[in-house]
Each structure stands twice: as C-alpha cells, then as structure tokens.
Amino acid sequence: MTKYSESYCDVLIVGAGPAGLMAARVLSEYVRQKPDLKVRIIDKRSTKVYNGQADGLQCRTLESLKNLGLADKILSEANDMSTIALYNPDENGHIRRTDRIPDTLPGISRYHQVVLHQGRIERHILDSIAEISDTRIKVERPLIPEKMEIDSSKAEDPEAYPVTMTLRYMSDHESTPLQFGHKTENSLFHSNLQTQEEEDANYRLPEGKEAGEIETVHCKYVIGCDGGHSWVRRTLGFEMIGEQTDYIWGVLDAVPASNFPDIRSPCAIHSAESGSIMIIPRENNLVRFYVQLQARAEKGGRVDRTKFTPEVVIANAKKIFHPYTFDVQQLDWFTAYHIGQRVTEKFSKDERVFIAGDACHTHSPKAGQGMNTSMMDTYNLGWKLGLVLTGRAKRDILKTYEEERHAFAQALIDFDHQFSRLFSGRPAKDVADEMGVSMDVFKEAFVKGNEFASGTAINYDENLVTDKKSSKQELAKNCVVGTRFKSQPVVRHSEGLWMHFGDRLVTDGRFRIIVFAGKATDATQMSRIKKFSAYLDSENSVISLYTPKVSDRNSRIDVITIHSCHRDDIEMHDFPAPALHPKWQYDFIYADCDSWHHPHPKSYQAWGVDETKGAVVVVRPDGYTSLVTDLEGTAEIDRYFSGILVEPKEKSGAQTEADWTKSTA
C-alpha cells in the first residue's frame, strides 16, 4: 500500500549536480544564520557522480569557491592548466605543433584554469554544505518530482507557499541508470544523444513494481537544476531555443600509451581529414580526450547510441594522432555527445520557480563552460534568495537573476556557436579553400575567447542591484560597475600581514562598502574620511537603518577601509571609530604598501583609484561591483540600498565615537 506524507519547505532544489549543490552551499550560510530555514535538495540518482562528467574550473569559479572556503581543498587535488599547444596538419597531412599559448591570459586573475573530475568537486561541496548548515541540508536520494502546481495569486505573499510539488521515492533499482551494455562506466544514459523519452525510461519503476512513498511538499521557492532534459523546465512549458549541428564527439577519460610529445599538456589538434581532438590532462595520470567522430547525426537529430563504443572513439583518435602512436592503457570513463547551442526563453516563473545550469542553456564542452556556468547561475541566485528568505531584502531583487544570467547565457551560446564550429571544421588546405577553417582564424578566436571563458569578463547591465547610472566610474576606473571586484594584494594594518583582499570578501550574504581612504595622513583628506565615518555612525545611515539592534554593526553591511599610506606613517587609532575601526577588531583596515616579504603591490593603481582622494566602492554579496562614488556620495549609497534592503523592526541606531583612552575593564 502506497504511503503518503505532507511537508513544507522554504526552498526545494531539484537536482544535486554542480548547479544544485552550489545553490545548497550558498543557501547553507543563511540556514546557519536562521536555523528554522528549511532547504531541501533532491536527486533521482541513488549516488553522486564518481567518474567522468565535467572537470574544468575557470578563474571566476575558483575565485567564488575561494570565498566559500572551498578553493584550497580543490586546488590541492586538481591538475593545473598552464599552456595550450596547437597542432595543425603540415604539407604532408601529418599533425605538427604550430604554436603554444597560455591557457589563461596572464594577469586576468590570481587563479588559472584547473581540472578535477566532477565527483571530487561535488564531494568537497557536499562536505562544506554539511559543515555550514550543521547537517541540516542533505541530498535526499532517490526522489523524483512527478507533479508541480503554482498558485500565481500567492506569488507576492512573503508568507505563502505557492508551489506544491509531488515527489516519489524511487527504488534503488530504478534510480540506477542503464549503461547501454558497455562494461566501461559511461554517461550515454544522460548524454544528449538520447531522447527525453529514453532518459525517462531509465528511471521508471520496473513493470509490476509498486511505487514508494508519495510526498506532497509545499514550497516557497523551487530551483530546477535537473539537467538538459529538465523536468522542471518542461513542466513550466519553457522552450529551448537554438540549433544543433550534425557533429558528434566522443569523450574518453583514460591513461594513454602514446609517443605524442604533448600528451600531458592541453592541446587543440586539427587533422587534415580525420577530425579534431582536444586534450585535457587530468589528475592521477588520467587524460581526457574529446574526439571528433566521423559519424553524423541523422536528419532530425536522431542518433543510434549503440554505434558509440570506446573502441570506435579510440580508433578515430588513432587516425587523428597519426603519425604518432596512440592507445589506451586504462579506460576510466567515456561518453558521446551531439553539439548544439540552446537557451530557454525564461529562467523563472513568478520569481517562485527558477531553473539553472543545463536546465536553461546547453552547449558544447570545449571551452569548459558547462559546470562553471551552472555553478555561477546558482551562485548568483543563491544570495538573492537567501536575503529575501531571511527578511533582509525585497523580493524585487529576484527579478535580477533572469536579467543577469539570461543575458550571459545568450552570450555564451553565441561564443560557443562560433568556437565549436571552428573546432569541428576541416582545416583549410590553402587560402582558396573556402570550405575549410583557417587555422589563423581558429587561433585568434581561441585567444579572444580566453577572457570570456575565464568568467572574468561578465559585465552585468544596469538593474536594481547594479547601479551604473549613479556611479562615478572615473573614481575607480578598473572597478567597473557590473563586473567582479578583482582581488589585489594588500597589507593588513594591524600586524603587517600581506594577503589578497579577495580573501576578506567571504560569501556570507553581506554587502561591502569599501572605503578607499586615500592619503589619510593628509589633513584635508582625513577631514573627508571623518565626515564619511560620521555619516556611517549616524542614525539615518544605511548601517543604522538596515542592521538589527541585536546584531553586530557589520552583520548586514561590512565596511572595510583601504588606505594608500605606509602603515609606519599612520596608526589604526587615527581612523575614526567605530564605523571604520570597530573597537578591539583588527581586520577592517588595510594598506596599499610594501611588507617585509613583498614589494609594493600598487593595488590602488590596479583598481584605478586616486591615491590621494580615494573613492567608495559598494560590492554585492557575490563579489560584483555595484556602485562607485566618492566620500561625499552618501546620497547615492542611501538610494542604492533603499531599493534593495528591508528595515528591521528594531534598528541598530546611531553610534558614538569610541574613546580609545578609556578602558572597558
């Protein structure tokens, strides 16, 4: 007899891949702050990923993982990507190395691309979720959604649960995907070579079996992170718009046996007639090979998956590698995929149900964007949802998720459309070969796409949380509003510790007001600094208005000062308290100066800030610059936060200047 149950939750995340886990990790911080917040994450698989899948982590993703406390653990296991080798056919049709270029543009970030298989990345995120949420958030397996109802009339009611989900608990048998007869672990069961009906069949109860418990869940919000064949997206009726090529690629994770000289270096290889290969060196001597296959998709996109075996992929790889030898000593995983670029028309319904990751955009894996873009989707959504659920922000900010991430997804599709066709095309034999791809054009696209692929080039348009119109961009030329606030080295004033300023901007739901105090030893400049500090301590400042009386002054908006003096020329106590220098706290004032073991970083110059007059920069909880103004720009700061934050019932109120000469003992 089927059991039925009923429950309530604030957020239900469907899918425990990279997008779903990132959503859970960001939201776990708000669960820590508000333990009665109920966040659930479900997945139809009985276990997480152990082999294969995505593997590349780009610069911006690593920066975000650092702010979540995850980057160091992942980097300790990952394989570094530093140089890409380009191979093209010579006059005899044999591949030869024609160039080497940096994998990541030098200076673009303190990180550059690394690779580690998805299973290990997910493991680190899962451990972090358990730690931060005190095990309140766990992946529940195997569950599958079967029905979703949305009461749009209740969408704007903050206390309502307008989304009703019906979930079914699956048996272990039905939650273990078929491997299509291959002995090697593979992902053909969820690659885009199969139809939606075929994927659904993998997870249906066997004939004659009874379904498990049915649970009705009343949700405030739902996030669909359930992949390219997203059930959530289809239930919402959102269409994927775009096109597919007839190119088919195979993928191998293997320990190779080869005399190819760059087998442990990232490579882009174009052969004369046999197709192309991309090489991605992995951890533990594994190498990933993206191998273009000779087979093409039939009209309508139908593909016979039984034709794609490891042997077929290896055989084609041997042709492309000629005259070098190539074989596989150990095969860890394989799959095949059909190149296509599609993006859904909408990313949310009533700002109550959202979709993210592959559920709303699909593309080729060549530029290492799939996992990265998916994680950054929910990194963007998570802080906005967290602030709304904890009563700190207005629901209007949720509209900016679709505004920001749909625009980026479309840019990604356009980039991948060009890049994947250049990669899959046959090299031009000469300048008169109009059907072939110019290798010079390919290299140019590769280099130009480097910054885009790194994730550091995102520039969000004007919206509620990104105030370009009011900003005085000339005051911080390189802190471009809408782009991520780039980390630079600084010295912590209290003890002279050299550090990256980005490490101070942990992802915990706080906005930052970064006070570039400039030359604070100058009397005129210090007068400006004191006036700004007096504003922050006043009854009507954004700190006083939006901070609850029972909370620390920096718990909602974190004020951090960076001055351009040498720390020997000014003392911490010279800065006005408590706004800029909270009593007995020492991580609020930093200097752009040299230290015993590091030269002067010239970070003011890197940020494009005048070393005398300074500036004020507001940074969102996800690390993106949202407002640039000066020390007199309090009206702009007031206006920015008034459109986003909600005043608590009991406010912090005005603060009086601390007297450092008196003991509190």
Curated annotation (Swiss-Prot):
GO MF assignments: FAD binding; phenol 2-monooxygenase activity
Pfam families, per database record: FAD_binding_3, Phe_hydrox_dim
Assembly, per entry: Homodimer.
Record note on what altering residue 290 to F does: Leads to a slightly higher redox potential but is reduced by NADPH much slower
Pathway named in the protein's UniProt entry: Aromatic compound metabolism; phenol degradation
Listed cofactors: FAD
Protein name per its UniProtKB record: Phenol hydroxylase
GO BP terms in the entry: phenol-containing compound catabolic process
Temperature and thermostability: Optimum temperature is 30 degrees Celsius.
Activity-regulation annotation: Inhibited by excess phenol. Heavy metals such AsCuSO(4), AgNO(3), or HgCl(2) severely inhibit activity.
Residues given in the record as substrate binding sites: 55, 290
Binding residues for FAD: 18-19, 43-45, 51-56, 118, 290, 358, 368-372
Catalytic activity: phenol + NADPH + O2 + H(+) = catechol + NADP(+) + H2O
Keyword Oxidoreductase found: yes
Annotated organism of origin: Cutaneotrichosporon cutaneum
Protein family: Belongs to the PheA/TfdB FAD monooxygenase family.
High-level lineage: Eukaryota, Fungi, Dikarya, Basidiomycota, Agaricomycotina
pH dependence: Optimum pH is 7.2-7.6.
Function summary: Hydroxylates phenol to catechol. Phenol is the best substrate, but the enzyme also accepts isomeric diphenols, hydroxyl-, amino-, halogen- or methyl-substituted phenols and, to a lesser degree, cresols.
EC number of this enzyme: 1.14.13.7
Record-linked InterPro entries: FAD-bd, FAD/NAD-bd_sf, Phe_hydrox_C_dim_dom, PHOX_C_sf, RIFMO-like, Thioredoxin-like_sf
Keywords, ordered alphabetically: Aromatic hydrocarbons catabolism, FAD, Flavoprotein, Monooxygenase, NADP, Oxidoreductase
